[in-house]
């Protein structure tokens, strides 16, 4: 995902609905690593609201240990907002920190961005 236009820190870049997925609805199978597993986010500690699948572009943002966006609670129920952590140039890739132990090797990234503490919502589900 890349920025179509330059934007300032704090800009909401996307607001997307989520589909809440109760943890009990996941199938107990081997191997655990299926395609849908890659697209589940932590959502809530509330029973039957533990996970969510993001709609819109949410599930195709790449990971970076030096992200330029974060996922926050959206203003409407069952939504996530993507918010710029710093000024972003037009054409710059938008990345967020998955917040879990990575299952792939991360490439070096020259840009360092200071980021706010992250809430639990929006972190990739640890598999």
Question: Which residues are covered by each model-predicted region?
Answer:
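Conserved catalytic SET/PR domain of SAM-dependent protein methyltransferases, capturing the structural core
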Residues: 1-127
